[in-house]
Design a protein with these regions (language model features):
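Vicinal oxygen chelate
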Residues: 13-16, 71-119
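Residue-level marker for the onset of beta-strands and adjacent loop->beta junctions
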Residues: 7, 28, 36-37, 69, ...
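Helix-adjacent hinge/juxtasegments
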Residues: 60-69
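Core segments of cupin and vicinal oxygen chelate
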Residues: 11-54
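Conserved catalytic-core motifs of GNAT/GCN5-like acyltransferases
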Residues: 30-36, 98-100, 125-127
Length: 127
């Protein structure tokens, strides 16, 4: 088997429209629609799907949990711009900036939470 990438993640949220709007506004991610009205956002070549806990779409995770995700975005902007942007959108930084190691090497990261308390790392590679 040759796995080469991640296609999407699915976040279980309280309110799909609120989440779509927040990710679009805060991270400037394009909104997408698929499969008869499901909504998500595009992140590079990947996407984030949103579902509610009692979603009718199958299959789903065995224990879909609101606020149970922890994932990282990669940013290309200078760290000062990232911090300023988050402040402009009243997004609280819960940790960082911190030195971290991402899949491609050393990075500096800050951590925020979305409206459902999912933990989002925003990393800027040092190279």
């Amino acid at each position: 088997m040759n796995i080469r990438d991640i296609d999407h993640i699915t976040l279980t949220v309280k309110d799909i429209e609120r989440s779509v709007r927040w990710y679009h506004e805060v991270f400037d991610l394009p909104i997408i629609e698929f499969d008869d009205g499901r909504r998500g956002v595009k992140v590079g070549k990947q996407k984030i799907n949103f579902q509610v806990a009692d979603t009718p779409h199958l299959p789903v995770a065995k224990h879909p949990t609101i606020g149970g995700a922890d994932f990282a975005f990669i940013a290309t902007d200078p760290l000062a711009n990232i911090l300023s942007h988050l402040t402009n959108y009243a997004v609280e930084i819960v940790d960082g900036p911190l030195p971290k190691t991402g899949a491609q090497g050393p990075m500096t990261s800050v951590y925020v939470r979305d409206p459902d308390e999912n933990l989002i790392e925003i990393g800027k590679y040092d190279n």
